[in-house]
């Protein structure tokens, strides 16, 4: 049986651009794409921490080292420049593979520089 698990995420990315008339997508600094284990044209989910919006789009590459996070097309209506977002990708896998799976988690500062990386999320304490 296949299950769907978190593959990789960019946590607390800061939107640097919103381009309504650009082809729909999310342009992400190519270095960050690689670090989070994402791929060009891969479907991603966006969770806007500032306004609660949740939507799907796909990855396009922005210039490496630019720290760009640009929401394009219709997705530009769901964010404001400066909003903090979570960008997540998921993958389907067999349960045996899921037992060994480690997601690529990238935690960002407000300027989209890398704060830290991990492959685990601590247990939430009550």
Curated annotation (Swiss-Prot):
Substrate binds at residues 57, 73-75. It comes from the Bacteria. GO terms for biological process: alanine biosynthetic process; pantothenate biosynthetic process. The keyword Cytoplasm applies. Binds 1 pyruvoyl group covalently per subunit. GO terms for molecular function: aspartate 1-decarboxylase activity. Its EC number is 4.1.1.11. Pfam families: Asp_decarbox (PF02261). The active site is at residues 25, 58. Its main location: cytoplasm. InterPro entries: Asp_de-COase-like_dom_sf, Asp_decarbox. Pathway: Cofactor biosynthesis; (R)-pantothenate biosynthesis; beta-alanine from L-aspartate: step 1/1. CDD domains: Asp_decarbox. Keywords: Autocatalytic cleavage, Cytoplasm, Decarboxylase, Lyase, Pantothenate biosynthesis, Pyruvate, Schiff base, Zymogen. GO terms for cellular component: cytosol. The modification Pyruvic acid (Ser) is found at residue 25. Catalyzes the pyruvoyl-dependent decarboxylation of aspartate to produce beta-alanine. This is Aspartate 1-decarboxylase. It comes from Teredinibacter turnerae (strain ATCC 39867 / T7901).
């Amino acid at each position: 049986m296949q299950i769907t698990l978190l593959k990789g995420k960019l946590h607390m990315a800061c939107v640097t651009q919103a381009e309504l008339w650009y082809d729909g997508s999310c342009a992400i600094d190519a270095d960050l794409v690689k670090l989070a284990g994402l791929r060009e044209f891969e479907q991603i989910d966006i969770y806007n921490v500032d306004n609660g919006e949740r939507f799907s789009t796909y990855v396009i590459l922005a210039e490496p080292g630019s720290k760009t996070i640009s929401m394009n097309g219709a997705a530009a209506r769901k964010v404001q420049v400066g909003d903090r977002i979570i960008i997540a990708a998921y993958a389907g896998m067999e349960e045996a593979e899921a037992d060994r799976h480690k997601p690529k988690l990238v935690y960002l500062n407000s300027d989209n520089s890398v704060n830290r990386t991990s492959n685990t999320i601590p247990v939430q304490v009550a």
